[in-house]
Structures are given as C-alpha cells and as structure tokens.
Amino acid sequence: MSFLNELFSAGVWGEKTPTAPQWKKWIHRKLSDNHCPECLKLHECWFLRTNAPSWPHHPFCHCVLEDIRYNDVLTKCRAVSAYSKFDPYLFNPESKYPHKKEKLFNSWGYTVVDAKWLQTEIEKQGLEKYVNGEYTLGKLDYNGQRISIRVEIPRKNQSSNVSFVTGWMVYPNGKIQLATPYGGK
C-alpha cells in the first residue's frame, strides 16, 4: 500500500498516522580537483533512502545525502519518455531493429496505433511507482543511474493483464526518463 493510501486509511479509521518515506538528494561536493564520473551523474538525483546507490560511493567520496520533503517528491517528480521509444522503436514498423519486441506487444493485442496510449500509461505507472520507491536499482556508470520499474497493462485480446519491466534513467530533481519500454518479463 502506498504512503498516501496508508495516510488516508489512518485518517478514516482514526489510526496512527504513518511515517512519511525518507527521500534523499545526492549532492556531489567539489572539494578537490578529482571527481568521480558516477558521483557527478548522481548530483541532485533523488532516491528513497532505503533504495539509493551505496553511500559513500567510494573511499574518497565527498558526496552527501540531503533530506527532501516527501511533499516535494509527490509534487515535483516527473516521468518522461520520447514517443520514438514506442514508434518506431518498440513497434518497429520498418524492421529496423532486431529486438522483435513488436511481436510480443502484438501478441497482447497492441499495434503501433496504441503507441501514444502505451507511452502515457507507462509514464503514469513509472512515476507512481518511482515516488512510492517501487523501483530496482540497476547499473550505475558514467552515463548515470539506471532503475527498473515493473508495470502492468491489460491485454487487448484477452481479459487479463500482463506485467513487464521498464528501464529508466534517473536525472536531477526527481526526473526519470524512459530508456526502454520493455526490459524483460
């Protein structure tokens, strides 16, 4: 159950108010001329404290973690994606990409006509799960911190849902950007 649902339930039933999740902003302090490329990419990125990259990141790390009010997380975080991640990449109408992901989505009843809906739905679920801390840390390197977020969509050709992992990059100030709309089951 998300924090907001727990808060609402506590208010309705007169229960103890739950503690807000602790979010942190990674701050890279420039205390020397040597800078870790990974720490530079993490600068001002937001993470749930219990689901953040290891800190300190290395033996000579000058970074600090600053508190962020959960209200700021709820109101300022955003999930974005390029339409091109869905059309032409995901649905691959000209067979430019060897991934065959379009066959999987076609088997669930989706076509390129659904690309905009999928983009909106994946952004919506990605944002909701990110602010709830429901993400898995992935690779961290000079490109930045990757996270995986599981989403669920209805099959268009059956009365059931399908769940899969989406891949994202974390950027400063609560922004996550879709790297791949389908990263695996």
Regions inferred by a protein language model and the residue ranges of each:
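Functional cores of ribonucleases/endoribonucleases
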Residues: A20-L31, H35-K41, Q119-K185
